[in-house]
Amino acid sequence: MGYTSKLALKICLVGLCLFSTLSAEHLEQKGNYIYKGEEAYNNKEYERAASFYKSAIKNGESLAYVLLGIMYENGRGVPKDYKKAVEYFQKAVDNDIPRGYNNLGVMYKEGKGVPKDEKKAVEYFRIATEKGYTNAYINLGIMYMEGRGVPSNYAKATECFRKAMHKGNVEAYILLGDIYYSGNDQLGIEPDKDKAVVYYKMAADISSSRAYEGLSESYQYGLGVEKDKKKAEEYMQKACDFDIDKNCKKKNTSSR
């Protein structure tokens, strides 16, 4: 399936999608500006969203530092500016916002707006995990898996993924599924397609395009489950519904 290396590149940015951990209840509790910013962002009214986050900052809502930093990192509603993104993530850290530590770690990992420093990235990811930010376990685990900023240690990587999984993180289920799908000599894990499918199904229950994609391929080729072309197409359609540009192309390829 070859997920792991490709997935790692994507998951290293965990925490930079805008509203991955914000509930409507939380937003309403904190005030209008962040909630209105979310609505504007979801409607692709990015300039309005950025304006609301700036107002939220003036209103003392420190989480808005992270959200505005992400806008600058992605160039949505404001000019793309990695240095400004770093400044806002740093302000979030100064206000002890767990997600700020994680996102600042990503910037150091990628060398965006700051000199690349993987050891510093690991430090920020670790602090974010200690403060309860679940996505940081994924980032920290990948650093251990790839030996970046720390010695390569698959056992510690897997431990991070399991901690994230127990907190309901979808990416953790997928990464653990990948490990069982391909096997891992360092962990003494033989390829186990059956167990991989179990993890992919759990991720799909939480809803994830990559999990549905994994299930589609498993059913298409009879890997860990009985071969079933119809189910393969159904799961790929669900993956397509999540990520139309990527997964619809894969759907067309796998149907051949």
Kindly give the residue locations of the regions a language model identified.
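Hydrophobic face of amphipathic alpha-helices that form TPR/SEL1-like repeat modules
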Residues: 33-42, 66-74, 103-110, 139-146, ...
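Alpha-helical segment of the N-proximal tetratricopeptide repeat
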Residues: 29-55, 59
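TPR/TPR-like (Sel1-like) alpha-helical repeat modules
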Residues: 226-244
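Short helix-capping/linker turns of helical repeat alpha-solenoids
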Residues: 28, 40-41, 58-62, 74-76, ...
